[in-house]
Amino acid sequence: MELRKSQVAMPVFLAIMSLMVSQVVFAEKDSGSMSPHDRALAEMQALKASLVRRNLPALVSPPPTPPQAVPGPRVYQVISYGADPTGKLDSTDAILKAMEEAFDGPNHGVLMQGINDLGGARIDLQGGSYLISRPLRFPSAGAGNLLISGGTLRASNDFPVDRYLIELKDESSKLQYIFEYITLRDLLIDCNYRGGAIAVINSLRTSIDNCYITRFGDTNGILVKSGHETYIRNSFLGQHITAGGDRGERSFSGTAINLMGNDNAVTDTVIFSARIGVMVSGQANLLSGVHCYNKATGFGGTGIYLRLPGLTQNRIVNSYLDYTGIVAEDPVQLQISGTFFLGDAFILLKSIAGYIRGVSIVDNMFSGSGHGVQIVQLDQRNTAFDDVGQVVVDRNSVNGMVEKSTVARGSVDGNGTSWTVDFNPVLLFPDLINHVQYTLVASEAGVFPLHALRNVSDNRVVVETNAPVTGTVYVTVNQGV
């Protein structure tokens, strides 16, 4: 468009200049022989020409301004660094080079102290499948706001068995946190039964989203150690690729997710094969929407293992334990609610030093095979739970299993002076009743016997009257108050 304007303006310019020259020449040539009237007319034409000459630049379009160069998005495509998307050749060096250039790219300030904001740089695996022979790591600590996504990583046959394909770690760093806001998304990581998939060490606000992690060795699929706020969501993890009922289930090993830090979350995630689904040894973690059918309890598997005796402070909500259960050591401040336990899956409270306080196991569903498996069990082989407080096991829906609770209600009919209600089949803890309420209803009109609570030992409540009476005793007991 600018070129066409220039082409149109140029003839106009030449015509005007020609007219102006002819008018001026004519005026100078004949001014001596002109009449006063003609001379005045010529002077007016000369004035008009000068005005046109003054405004002439406005009639001619200036040449177009060359477009300014716009920086392209900082997407580091690994194929351009020599990575082989077919998975036939080792792509480790090429991907490490892309990670190095992303790390050294322009920054947009800092996040936490010592961590450069890389402005949302992306390392794009371009939908390829890449053979990896050693861990993928950044050159050093100090990177943040970066995404790695969109492809498959497969461990080579000589990948170190004690390492992880992606490692966010730097043993030499003195920073409080070494990485921040690193996102791993849309990845399939095949560990080839060598090492693990992802290690997040002392990092802050890390996201692992929509990842499929499989064939990890007798180690961890994902390891989170120290740091804060690693969020694992919408992901699938399994040592062996199966959909349940696998003939080799007895031999499943390894741990799918190992949380050795605080303030992390695992949400909407499936764990389909491993000896332990989720191991937790840090406080203030949240597990929500987690489906574990990693290895049946009868084969030695555990869905979720809480190994932090004395200060648990974790929540398991709205999850699904499928033929595998939960183990908690000396739990203090633990919530398990809204969770479905299928196939005789149960909760085991394991005594290490005898502490259990602030535990809430409520509003869950348990479904079993009718073989007499208790929904909540105690392991007191090390020592008995002798420090019990604020424990509530109640309002659980039970089908085909034995209900256990810290709150129980019972009644007994009789004709005499003593009524005994045995709560051992229901109460969770042996020989522990902290609170009792009872009501005696006499069947005979006009009878007002004296009555009293005489004994609550061995989880049995005994009520006696001063005279024989026909009636019913209703009792409510609580172990957790």
Swiss-Prot record:
Glycans are attached at residues 415, 455. Its main location: secreted. Disruption phenotype: The mature pollen grains are arranged in a tetrad. A layer of material is frequently deposited on the surface of the distal region of the pollen grains. Expressed in the tapetum cells in the anthers and in the ovules of open flowers. PbH1 repeats lie at residues 203-226, 261-282, 356-377. GO terms for biological process: cell wall organization; microsporogenesis; pollen exine formation. Keywords: Cell wall, Cell wall biogenesis/degradation, Glycoprotein, Glycosidase, Hydrolase, Repeat, Secreted, Signal. SUPFAM superfamilies: Pectin lyase-like. It catalyses: (1,4-alpha-D-galacturonosyl)n+m + H2O = (1,4-alpha-D-galacturonosyl)n + (1,4-alpha-D-galacturonosyl)m. Residues 1-27 form the signal peptide. GO terms for molecular function: polygalacturonase activity. Its EC number is 3.2.1.15. One of its GO terms (cellular component) is extracellular region. It is found in: Secreted, Cell wall. The keyword Cell wall biogenesis/degradation applies. It comes from the Eukaryota. Belongs to the glycosyl hydrolase 28 family. Polygalacturonase required for degrading the pollen mother cell wall during microspore development. This is Polygalacturonase QRT3. It comes from Arabidopsis thaliana. The gene is QRT3.
